[in-house]
Amino acid sequence: MSSEQLQADQVPTKAGIAYKVRNMAFFYGTKKALDNISVDLPAKSVTAIIGPSGCGKSTFIKALNRIAEAETKVRIDGQIELFGQNIYDPKVNITRLRRRVGMVFQRPNPFPMTIYDNITYGPRVFGFKGNYDEIVETSLRRAALWNEVKDKVKTSALGLSGGQQQRLCIARSLAVNPDVLLMDEPCSALDPIATLRIEELIETLRDQFTIIIVTHNMQQAGRVSQNTLFFNTDESRIGQLVENGPTKEIFFSPKDKRTEDYISGRFG
């Protein structure tokens, strides 16, 4: 990758730290999936998470809004703070946490209802007051979808193309005004044109939201992110954070040889 391909502004954020992760370990039953993860994730910027398959990238972001707890026999040690609050404190309201931290998955998952009802679903659940028509338009505009669907918001969301469905899922997350948007390989099921639109959308949102994206696409990580985390597994196949820092540094002057080998395609 050339320096010209790093389209995202590499200036560190001035918005502070969104997540502080300290000594985090993650277990599925007795199997340890992640070990000794400590990292700060900056607010109002895009952080990319890269690494070979099976190194715990998706597991890590699922821990950031506690969605991993939906799986059986999961245990998380250590501490994860979101803007200074320990999200695993027993007093934390998980429903409210997930309003603050939206999630977009690999494959588009619109609800089997109208476009309008997809957008208003979250605001209704959380008891938002106000003009729902306005929420729908604002959310769809934020997701760069309004002009394509404004005349058919009362039709089924399942009739949209794959790329449109994924942008609808992003709009649905934005409708509840989250602080953070987690994206787990959001373009893996999309064609190149739809992928480009998602990347352009991420760029427009990065100054408003904290965005954390898992991707196997090195070029995509370079284009959209200001910060990058590289995960790998140790000899016991336990995921670990090898290196993190500004994307430009990770791609062009990594400190760890494993990072350099992965970026250059020598393994992974």
Curated annotation (Swiss-Prot):
Superkingdom of origin: Bacteria
Top enzyme category: translocase
Membrane topology of the entry: Peripheral membrane protein
SUPFAM superfamilies per record: P-loop containing nucleoside triphosphate hydrolases
Matches recorded under Pfam families: ABC_tran
Reaction(s) this enzyme catalyzes, per UniProt: phosphate(out) + ATP + H2O = ADP + 2 phosphate(in) + H(+)
Chief place where the protein resides: membrane
Gene Ontology molecular function: ATP binding; ATP hydrolysis activity; ATPase-coupled phosphate ion transmembrane transporter activity
Domain (ABC transporter) ranges: 19-263
Any Gene Ontology CC annotation: plasma membrane
Binding residues annotated for ATP, in chain numbering: G51, P52, S53, G54, C55, G56, K57, S58
Keywords: ATP-binding, Cell inner membrane, Cell membrane, Membrane, Nucleotide-binding, Phosphate transport, Translocase, Transport
One Gene Ontology term from the biological process aspect of the record: phosphate ion transmembrane transport
EC number: 7.3.2.1
InterPro entries per record: AAA+_ATPase (IPR003593), ABC_transporter-like_ATP-bd (IPR003439), ABC_transporter-like_CS (IPR017871), P-loop_NTPase (IPR027417), PstB-like (IPR005670)
Family according to the record: Belongs to the ABC transporter superfamily. Phosphate importer (TC 3.A.1.7) family.
Listed name of the protein: Phosphate import ATP-binding protein PstB 2
Organism the protein comes from: Gloeobacter violaceus (strain ATCC 29082 / PCC 7421)
